[in-house]
């Protein structure tokens, strides 16, 4: 849901013309992330326990209205969840997602494509092994304050409930139903931001998937903008003065758990890309 919202809210902007070297493009991406993550925090939880207004969250009219809140010349002063069709009253909680996840994208000789993300939450999960499998400690993905201002939190702890996850394995198709791109990532709450950035870089900026994944990634937590401190983040770090001029007053440069990979269809075959920040590789067998 978050990736669909991030991308769709930006449709009225010409990201292709702006390009990857323009601070305005990254500003727009950050603003769209703010809106999408506000909705995610308020409305997304285990659908067996809470009413998730999925159709309303990705409705074209709702997306259009949310996207119109974004300005190319300034930041939004305050961002809160919207009121999509079918949404019950909700308040955002506070979660503590941990970036210990794995993802792979694969294609076989017949063109069948898979995007798979798996997680045990923390490093080695719960520290327990059963039948050769590491058991997870996914309880830490819940919001531990169950009620805010008298309103139940969608991702609150309940017996037998699945916690909200950031896992976002994604396959992108063209208008004829052919696969263009498969991409996913590890990195806890940064996953939707990594995936959205990679899709924009391939589709709008015409980057090879390897270059798209290697581009800097920014993550937004409320009003705080996080820029990675790795060498890959240097081009984005150089844009900080311009981003501050657009109203992003709280910017932090720090290490972030970015580990994306993907495959894209090219003339005559497929091309892979793996995050240079991680131990992953692109490999043909």
Tell me what each language-model feature is.
Residues 81-92, 147-157, 245-247:
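Short Pro/Gly-enriched beta-strand edge/turn motifs at strand-loop
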Residues 8-11, 185-207:
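Alpha-helical support elements that line or immediately flank enzyme active sites
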